[in-house]
Structure formats: C-alpha cells, structure tokens
A protein has these predicted regions:
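Flexible coil/loop interruptions and hinge/linker segments embedded within long fibrous stalks
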Residues: 3-49, 56, 60
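Helical scaffold of the NTase/Pol beta-like nucleotidyltransferase catalytic core
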Residues: 50-65, 69-131
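Conserved catalytic core of two-metal-ion nucleotidyltransferases
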Residues: 99-123, 165-223, 232-333, 338-368
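Active-site nucleotide-donor binding segment shared across nucleotidyl transfer reactions
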Residues: 119-152
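Beta-sheet entry/capping signal
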Residues: 128-129, 153, 310, 317
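Catalytic metal-binding acidic patch
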Residues: 143-164, 315
Length: 368
C-alpha cells in the first residue's frame, strides 16, 4: 500500500463525516480549555488560601511569642529576690537546676577533669585557649556543664593548636586526633586521653587573626567554604573518601584533602579577611571549622577576647574571653532565656554506651 492510499484510508469517506470529525475536535479542544481554566482557578484559590493561612500563622506565632514573653517576665519577676536583678535571678535559677545523672554525669566529670589537665598543660607551655559555645555558656550561666550537654568546646589560635599538637606528640598521657569530616566539610580536632577506653574529649576550634572584627567582611569566608566543599566533591582523586565520612589526617591520601583546606585558607588571606597577628584588629572563625548557615560568621574584636579571664567550671578554673557576654550574645542572643534544645541536643557520645560495658567501668574508676 502506498503512502497516498494509507492517508486516504485514514480520512473520513464523506463531507458529513469530515464535518462531524471537526466538531469532535472542537469539543475536545473546548474540554481541554475548560480543564486548563479549572487548573488555573484551582491554583489561584490555592495561592489565595496559602497566603491567607500564612498570614494567620504568622499572627498566631506573634501572639504566642508575646504571650510567652509576658509569662516569662511574670515568672522571673516573682522568682527574683528583693534587691536582686532579673539577670542574677536567672543565673541563680540555672545554677540550682539538677545536675545530669548516671553515665552522662560521669562523662561530664571526666571531661571536666580532662579540661583541668588541659588548662595546666597550656599554662605550662604558654598556650592560650578559651571556652566557647556550650562550654562558655555552662561556665557563665551554670558554673559547669549544662545538664543536658555532653561535649566540651574550646577555641585556640591556629599557631597555638599547631604547637599543642607538637607538644602532645611527646606526651604519652594524651593524644590529639585530626579528622576530616566530609558530612560538613570540616577539620575536626580533638584532645583526648591516650587511654581509648575513656570517651572524654575536648573539641578544639581554630581561630585566625583578622584584619578587623567586621562580620560583613568575615561573611566572605562562607563563600570560600562553599567553594571548598564543591572542589572536594568534584575531586575524583578523593574517591577513596566515601565509605566513611571521617578520614584521619595521618591516613594515606589525606595530603590531597589537606591541600584543599590549605588552598582555602590561603584564599581567606588573599581576600583581605585573615592576616598576620601584627596587623590584626580581631580574630575570626577559621575556614577549617564547620559552617552553621543559621548564624553570621563569627568575628570578634581583640578587646572582647584578650586578655583572657578565669571562670569556674565544675570546680576547675578555666579560660574565658575578656567579654564573655559579647561572645554568648553573638551565638545565642539572650542566653539567659529558657532554652529550647533540652531534649533535642545532639548526642556526641552514645548515652547507651555510657550506662553499660567497658566505657561505664572506665569512667567510674576514672572520675572518682
């Protein structure tokens, strides 16, 4: 059969049939337009309802926030003693909160003991460190660990961390682990006991000297961090870094990862944020650390940081920034307000392991 014959067989045999076919096509087109119009109306209605609901949700949230603030104000006013400020009443409240119990408390006491030894080691060798984040909050607000916190956070200048690593290399009591974390593209540094059965550790975060404490300028480092993560993701040579997101700095191939971080650090100098100590007007959260997108990039003036002060933490005297209040407000806002992460705080050590087995036994004998 020719193409012409095939086309003829597919066409209506009469004008009437052709006309009927045309009417059918018009009807189908009309139905299609009606369906399209219906979808448009549905989308417009859905958008209108969404906008209306969003406005109502925002209004409800504002009302709840206002009510929450009013109730807190009323509660604190009734809680405070005569001639006691609201802030002092809040601190008194936090310091009277029950301590953690069981394995969690053993871990905290073990970390406090380790921190005391770390403090002595740093003082003996002229190294500067200071409490940051939850550890600083605990020192100022609780006089020790926040009851639901299970890790210890300390900040150090890059050169002091490098010296510390050398010192610990000749000290059989302790060890330092340097691990690259692919999940959050960071360099994780921890100070621990040489005994691997003791799970206590101190997280060490790197700070660099900065031209100024200008946070808008420091935000440029966030872009460099994004570039770092993308470069690592696209580096086919790093295919070995996959089964486990944690890769030790001393392992084979780590020099390739290290080179990416060093290149990013050089860019932080080239862009005019990081500088030498002699030219510094502040300090800045280094690109080696993890990046929290919910907060501005941390930068502090020299006056807010140095000279370091001393504060008590679980009976141990530790270093805190010169202006701890400025540090805490930059991280938490009103840090004396009631927290929202009591039950959702991330567990750095398995709490099940703390209640049984070799870990529990090691902590019990160690913390006593």
């Amino acid at each position: 059969m020719s193409l012409k014959d095939a086309v003829k067989r597919g066409l209506p045999s009469s004008y009437a049939q052709l006309s009927a076919l045309g009417e059918s096509v018009d009807a189908i087109r009309s139905q299609m337009l009606t369906a399209s119009e219906a979808r448009q109306i549905h989308d417009e209605l859905h958008w209108d309802i969404s906008v209306q609901l969003l406005g109502e949700i925002r209004a409800l949230r504002n009302e709840l926030d206002a009510h929450d603030s009013q109730m807190k104000m009323f509660a604190w006013e009734n809680y405070r003693k005569e001639n006691e400020s609201i802030d002092d009443a809040k601190k008194r409240f936090y310091r009277l909160l029950p301590k953690a119990t069981g394995g969690m408390r053993l871990l905290q006491l073990g970390c406090a003991k380790l921190m005391g030894e770390f403090d002595a080691l740093c003082r003996e060798n002229g190294l500067q460190y200071w409490a940051v984040y939850g550890t600083l909050l605990g020192a100022i607000r609780h006089g020790g660990f926040i009851p639901w916190d299970d890790d210890t956070d300390l900040g150090m200048m890059r050169s002091d961390i490098e010296r510390l690593i050398e010192i610990v290399g000749d000290d059989d009591r302790y060890r330092i682990t340097v691990v690259y974390d692919r999940c959050v593209t960071c360099k994780q540094i921890r100070f621990l006991y040489a005994d691997t059965d003791i799970p206590c550790f101190l997280d060490l975060f790197v700070y660099d000297w900065a031209v100024s404490p200008d946070r808008q300028k420091a935000e440029e480092l966030r872009g460099l961090r994004a570039e770092l993560a993308e470069e690592i993701e696209c580096d086919n040579v790093l295919s070995f870094w996959g089964p486990s997101p944690y890769y030790p700095d001393a392992a084979d191939g780590a020099d390739r990862i290290r080179a990416h971080f060093e290149d990013c650090r050089q860019k932080s100098r080239d862009c005019g944020v990081v500088c030498d100590k002699e030219k510094a007007g502040g300090i800045v959260w280094a690109v080696d650390n993890l990046n929290c997108s919910r907060t501005p990039w941390y930068a502090y003036s020299l006056e807010d940081t140095f000279p370091l002060k001393r504060a008590m933490f679980e009976g141990v005297e530790i270093n805190v920034p010169a202006n701890a209040d400025a540090y805490l407000r930059s991280c938490y806002g009103d840090y004396l307000d009631l927290p929202k992460d009591i039950h959702s705080h991330f567990q750095h050590v398995s709490h099940d392991d703390l209640e049984a087995g070799a870990t529990r036994d090691a902590l019990s004998g160690f913390a006593e």
